[in-house]
Regions:
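Conserved small/polar residues in nucleotide/adenosyl-binding loops
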Residues: 16, 282-287
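Mid-domain beta-loop-alpha active-site segment that forms a flexible
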Residues: 1-64, 202, 206
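Glycine-enriched catalytic-core subsegment of oxygenase/oxidase enzymes
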Residues: 45-48, 53, 57-60, 64-284
């Protein structure tokens, strides 16, 4: 934003900013759109993928991807794009009873970008389910469709499986039960604690997967599939001398019916250092 707005009396801008870069206050940041600016959030991926991608992460026993690539509408240096697509490739995992776990691709779309309609999807039926999101599992024998947050799952064939209930269910999960399950676990003795459904041992790696998608979008200017070493938390195919530029301002104009393009770019930065910074948390210094 090019202008500075008056800070509302009800807002402590310094406290809100915390360890992030101190920017002049602008009403576009708060209370909702802060998540779209890189100084404060991670765009639609950080906002919704932590909910929608939890189903494949848990069901398919995913951990670290080995490859990732991203593409989007115009990417600016200060904020997330309007629409984006990320592809994450995960290695084969240990097979489960009656279910093989080969290498698998996970695709994320947002901002109006959509996956292809699965073969056999009912004509006239909207692909997007209620809640503004869906997950499609493409299997060798059937296709599973889940609504936003994994709700209302159904098989494309119409078959109703006799699915065993193998996971503990949280009562009233969508109405405060999920949060109280976490509070309950915090209060229990470690010796007898029933782990919450939102345990950090699962939530941490799952959110690393989401953040990897954000990095893929921000590194798309390298024009390559990025290879990831999860154990050592680093990309293995970004060279020491590779550089990256991002658009600061899109100077697109139409004059007398003719378009003109006059983008303002950042200076080139070292791509390897740029990729390492979000992983190392160098922006946050603790005493």
């Amino acid at each position: 934003p090019e202008k500075e707005d008056r800070i509302p009396k009800t807002l402590n801008w310094d406290l809100f900013t915390g360890p992030a870069k101190m920017n002049p206050y602008n009403e576009i940041y708060h209370p909702w759109n802060w998540r779209g600016w890189w100084d404060y959030g991670t765009g639609a991926l950080g906002d919704m993928a932590c909910h929608i991608l939890h189903q494949p992460f848990r069901a398919l026993k995913l951990l670290y991807p080995t490859k990732v690539e991203g593409s989007s509408t115009l990417l600016l240096n200060a904020c997330a794009p309007q629409a984006q697509h990320v592809k994450l490739t995960f290695p084969a995992r240990e097979n489960m009873p009656k279910v093989a776990m080969p290498e698998v691709e996970v695709h994320w779309y947002d901002g109006g970008m959509m996956p292809d309609r699965p073969k056999g999807f009912p004509e006239g039926k909207q692909l997007m389910q209620s809640g503004g999101g869906l997950t499609i599992f493409h299997g060798t024998k059937d296709t599973l469709i889940c609504g936003c947050y994994g709700q209302n799952p159904w098989l494309l064939s119409g078959r109703v499986p006799n699915a065993p209930k193998v996971c503990r269910r949280v009562p009233k999960a969508m109405n405060g039960g999920h949060e109280m399950d976490w509070v309950r676990a915090c209060k229990e003795s470690p010796s007898s604690r029933v782990m919450p459904k939102s345990d950090f041992s699962e939530a941490g790696p799952m959110n690393e997967m989401v953040a990897m998608g954000v990095l893929a979008i921000r590194l798309q200017g390298l024009n390559k599939t990025l290879e990831w070493d999860g154990a050592n938390m680093r990309f293995t195919n970004i060279g020491d001398d590779e550089t990256l530029r991002t658009v600061i301002k899109d100077g697109f104009k139409i004059h007398n019916g003719h378009p003109s393009f006059d983008k303002t770019w950042t200076d080139p930065v070292n791509a390897k250092a740029f990729a390492e910074e979000p992983v190392s948390y160098t922006h946050l210094t603790l005493p």
